[in-house]
Amino acid sequence: MTSSADLTNLKELLSLYKSLRFSDSVAIEKYNSLVEWGTSTYWKIGVQKVTNVETSISDYYDEVKNKPFNIDPGYYIFLPVYFGSVFIYSKGKNMVELGSGNSFQIPDEIRSACNKVLDSDNGIDFLRFVLLNNRWIMEDAISKYQSPVNIFKLASEYGLNIPNYLEIEIEEDTLFDDELYSIMERSFDDTFPKISISYIKLGELKRQVVDFFKFSFMYIESIKVDRIGDNIFIPSVITKSGKKILVKDVDHLIRSKVREHTFVKVKKKNTFSILYDYDGNGTETRGEVIKRIIDTIGRDYYVNGKYFSKVGIAGLKQLTNKLDINECATVDELVDEINKSGTVKRKIKNQSVFDLSRECLGYPEADFITLVNNMRFKIENCKVVNFNIENTNCLNNPSIETIYGNFNQFVSIFNTVTDVKKRLFE
């Protein structure tokens, strides 16, 4: 007889199986462990282990329409498709980036709200979110049983950002052209850039997507950063005429291989242009592009997830957290705080600056040493004043790439610890 615990496991296995395409590595590992359990318990359960699943929602969206077409009579819901990084939240209870399959940490209140929405309707396959300028918007909800409008209303009650949408009855064959597209785009009446419009006909599950645009080339004058939150900065690409080209995040900047004082390909919409990442933008390797972008942005910033952050105060916070002492705003405060604890002072004295700085940032030791062995440093008064990576091939390792993107932060902490150690023991 099947036990209550077995039923719980089987239900979880079925739920994970249905959402495999939207799963991250953690969810896949859980799924595989349940498959192994099910096979050993029941011999045959009808599903198999998986090694890698590409996150995809293509079954729910038809081919994108790039040219004018006739739309049939009927009742429709029109939704904006926003510019930004697309994520899927599904029964696996993880926010997973479309395409890469990488999971993304979200605030507890957003996770709780998403779970409440999913639990309200067991026919929901997934919630679609977009992340732009560190702001989450739920832009679609796929359910077998109800319209996304109903789910939007519930999501809004739970505190999630939802899109403006249009409910329209079309009474006769209508040409959907640039003019109608522009009217609808304006009717959504919000400030977020929209890359396309999707629509659903009443009674149908599959979305249609309309994306009218033109390709163009623009001359890049500079690459800068814009502040979008508390020590969060997004890349900004400026043309010779002073216009901004929209960039999703740091990875988008890298993939496009954009370089100052060159032309780049863009998708031109009605009111803005989007940086287009394609192979024609150059022959540089990803590692070479990362090095150049970081050199361009400057030593005051480091890669922090999808965005940039400024070195300095964040480094002091990580150092005080590692030492388990009160937060300090300056090096003077840090020295005073360390002097209050003999244990902390001995730790500073006995551990190398190199190791303590690395541990503060949680870098894997082997990957960190591999990176350092491919770099050259300029040292003055025991502090790093400059560094250069001599072989970018090591950046093919994603972990090493992440460490290098964050290396300005390491240098800041290293120099701070060096300064603190001198004041304490010399």
From Swiss-Prot:
Entry's family note: Belongs to the orthopoxvirus OPG148 family.
Native source species: Monkeypox virus
Keyword Nucleus: no
Coiled-coil segments: none
Superkingdom classification of source: Viruses
Protein name: DNA polymerase processivity factor component OPG148
Keywords for the protein's UniProt record, in alphabetical order: DNA replication, Phosphoprotein
Keyword Lyase: no
Function according to Swiss-Prot or TrEMBL: Plays an essential role in viral DNA replication by acting as the polymerase processivity factor together with protein OPG116. Serves as a bridge which links the DNA polymerase OPG071 and the uracil DNA glycosylase.
Gene3D superfamilies registered for this protein in UniProt: 6.10.140.1880
Entry's Gene Ontology BP terms: DNA replication
Quaternary structure (record): Interacts with the DNA polymerase catalytic subunit OPG071. Interacts with UDG/OPG116. Component of the uracil-DNA glycosylase(UDG)-OPG148-polymerase complex; OPG148 and UDG form a heterodimeric processivity factor that associates with OPG071 to form the processive polymerase holoenzyme. Interacts with OPG117.
